[in-house]
Regions:
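Core catalytic alpha/beta fold that binds nucleotide/phospho-ligands
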Residues: 1-227
Length: 227
């Protein structure tokens, strides 16, 4: 597991995990710390590499949370919020989030703010512009179209990671359309206003530099903001 530089903002530890690391590394491929439901989920994957990656990323998350809570990984049990975001039912403010893409996982942990992370591996997309028009705000689409064609797909994927991170920090699931707010196609730190049915929420998002070909972002909710 690779500890990444802390982002500008509240204390957030970020970890990059190679899910294809040797089986001896930190017990990432052991089933011992997984719950019965996690083991059952791992057994339902059709492809062996998907099951292996699932086990590895859940073990990595539990190992990191165990270090934060001084608990054994086996004793950590997740509960889901209203829209499916996992939490630890410990009665203490420990926030975490995880994202994965093609053999890698990104994990964020904070004691001060609800957070969200997202990682994407660049890949060819036949009709990505149609998807971008549905997912980007009008301002983001306009900014995207000012870039040279060869840079547009990567910029769209970068924007997508920023939007995903914001929505995961908010814990809103799919109840908010990504095109209804601006997260920006640039990598810089940005404040983001997100309107839900009953309220308006303020988050911050910044893109993350990774030591491999991937795009990633971390977002955190501002005080007194969130569902």
């Amino acid at each position: 597991m690779i500890r990444l530089p802390d982002p500008v903002g509240p204390p957030i530890s970020l970890w990059l995990v190679n899910l294809d690391a040797p089986s001896s590394e930190a017990g990432l491929h052991s089933l011992d710390a997984l719950s019965a439901s996690e083991r059952a989920r791992a057994g339902r994957f059709h492809h062996a590499h998907d099951a292996r990656w699932y086990v590895a990323r859940h073990n990595a998350l539990k190992l990191l949370l165990a270090a934060e809570t001084h608990m054994h990984p086996k004793d950590l049990h997740f509960v889901e919020g209203e829209h499916g975001k996992p939490y630890l039912n410990l009665g203490s403010p420990l926030h975490f989030n995880m994202s994965h893409a093609k053999g890698w996982a990104l994990i964020g942990i904070s004691t001060e703010a609800a957070i969200g992370v997202d990682i994407e591996r660049p890949h060819p997309m036949a009709d990505w512009s149609a998807l971008a028009q549905r997912c980007l705000s009008a301002a983001e689409w306009e900014d995207l179209m000012t870039l040279p064609p060869g840079q547009q797909l990567r910029a769209f994927l970068q924007c997508w990671t920023r939007k995903e991170a914001c929505l995961k920090a908010l814990g809103s699931g799919l109840t908010i359309e990504p095109g209804t707010f601006d997260a920006g196609i640039e990598a810089a730190l940005r404040e983001v206003s997100i309107a839900s049915v009953h309220d308006k929420h303020l988050s911050s998002v910044v893109s993350i530099d990774l030591p491999m070909d991937a795009l990633a972002a971390v977002a955190w909710m501002q005080p007194a903001s969130g569902l």
